Amino acid sequence: MKIISKKDDLMKEFKYIELIEQIKKEFKIDYYGDHGISHWQRVYENTQKLSNYYKIESEVFELFALLHDSKRHDEYEDRYHGVRAAGYIQKLLRNGDMVLNKEDTERLLYACANHTKSDKEDPLFNDIVVQICFDSDRLDIGRVGYDVDPSYLATKYAKSLVSE
């Protein structure tokens, strides 16, 4: 199945089509804006690039791409949107709308709740799946007019992409 962005005709295959429809119904900001479907597609593509480099597969990557900004109330000023996204994920899991093992649940909750800040002392910060999620979002910061700052990236490969 494919999701097509009407705004710029981007096409991307996502596994969680029903989830996308649910997110879209509840999305409080512009679905085609800076934190909408086109951004989610780029974040997912970034997760694939990084995870292929590190030879890691995880269900968390697509879910992070779709959910990390899903509970924004404002396009730019919304410091608690990641925490709200984590709460939404817990609801989806309780309702059986998605199923993850314990380790991936912890990774996804942590990555969404903390994607705008980083506690490098937290053990989950050092998890490569979480780091790929963080870097995949941060590599797309150019969409809102900022340059990617390598000091905010967690993986060596993401840092090397910025210096290319």
Describe the residue ranges of each PLM region.
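His-Asp-centered metal-binding catalytic motifs of divalent-metal-dependent phosphohydrolases/nucleases
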Residues: S58-Y76, H81-A85, L109-T116
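Divalent metal-dependent phosphate-bond-processing catalytic cores, especially two-metal-ion Mg2+/Mn2+ enzymes
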Residues: K2-K15, K25-I56, L67, N95-M98, ...
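An active-site-proximal "capping" alpha-helix that borders the catalytic cofactor pocket
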Residues: V43-Y44, Y80-G96
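Short, amphipathic alpha-helical segments
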Residues: R79, V83, K102, E106, ...
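Short secondary-structure transition/capping motifs
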Residues: Y32, G36, D74-H81, N101
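Short, glycine-biased loop/turn motifs at secondary-structure junctions and
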Residues: I20-Q22
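Short, well-structured alpha-helical segments
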Residues: I37, Q41, E62, K102-A113
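Juxtamembrane helix-loop transition sites at the ends of transmembrane segments
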Residues: Y76, I89-Q90, A158
